[in-house]
Amino acid sequence: LRDAGVAASDLSAVAVTVGPGLSMCLRVGVVAAQDVCAQHNIPIVPVHHMEAHGLVARLAGGTERVKFPFLALLVSGGHNQLILTRGVGDHVILGSTLDDALGEAYDKTARLLGLDVGGGGGPALEALAVEGDENAYKFPVPLRRRKNCDFSYAGLKTAVRLAVERDLGVPEGDAAFTAVCAPGQVPRPEHARVLTEAGMSDEAVEARHKTKADIAASFQKAAVKHLEERTKRAVEWAGDVLNEGEGTRGMASLSCIVVAGGVAANATVRESLSAVASDAGLPLVTPPAKWCTDNGVMVAWAGVERLALGLAEEPPAPWLGGDGDGKDGGERREVPLLPRWPLGSRDERATGETKSSKKKGMAAPLTPAGGEASDLVAPGIP
């Protein structure tokens, strides 16, 4: 606000993520947002984290270009989802991860290879893959026999681990790391590299680096191919959903494919999905890299879209009773946290997430099951 030259009293509302996520983390943001809203008597706009990832493409690409409906591929460390977005708060889940998300697979593979993951495992592995031969290892493309839009990376991760153990001889177990760890230091994959490469000739170290690059490139080829195949099918499924009503065949169509989330910053992912979009006759929209990872801009933009539709809550009272600090029996009226909050109803052809299949504690979807195509389009926002 200081950099923008805007005072808190000038704000029209405050948007804040209320789910999904860890309750402790969500609460920090919600409490701060409520304080500002209560102090300045302005509305608070609850935002779904994954919807924010998808909607920010409308800020990046322009609302005239990224019109509803569009297909969104949300790829991050914790999520892989293919979403038909028909409007603000109107989403159909066509596919999601059955176990591990792509971002997690990138991170774990980078660690297996002993890369420096201080700047993120994904960027480190992508940089190494440029030096490798993507055809050196025939890693399996996941779920090719399942004709749906779901994702799975657990099997691919296992194949990579076996290749690393076979061809790089990385020691197993914490005991192998302790020889190069300082007292009390947590063992990390790079310690295995130090231990294994100790005493090697320069030629051997170089050959070892080439093997790592080949594994990285081959992993990336299989991982991204999985994204390609699922996205191609999702384009078809989205068309089915949009035209499933009697007399609607051919009446509705996608405006574009949106790729968002942290992994969307990967250049190989963007290049591959550009080809998928081109084959489908659709533009591909990817937010700038700085808006692909978790950021405040995407939450603010989702707030703008929801506020324009009247999807906001009244300013919260500072405290109900007590002296205002909440420590003497006063109770605060708080915006509910929704740590387990599905983005929308699930297409009947989608398998769904087995990793989080328990229904206990699950909030109602942002988009109710059986919901009609949304009329929630803000005035002036196509």
Enumerate the language-model features and the residues they cover:
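Short beta-strand-loop/turn "lid" adjacent to the catalytic site in phosphate-handling enzymes
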Residues: L1-Q34
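Conserved phosphate-binding catalytic cores of ATP/NTP-utilizing and phosphoryl-transfer enzymes
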Residues: I42, P46-L71, A302
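Glycine-rich phosphate-binding loops at beta-strand->alpha-helix junctions
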Residues: L254-L273
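Conserved phosphate-binding/catalytic loops in two-lobed NTP-binding clefts
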Residues: P46-V47, S255-C256, L273-V299, P315-W319
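Activation-segment/catalytic-loop signature of the eukaryotic protein kinase fold
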Residues: K212-V224, E228-T231
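A short helix-loop
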Residues: R65-F68, L74-V75, Q81-T211, S274, ...
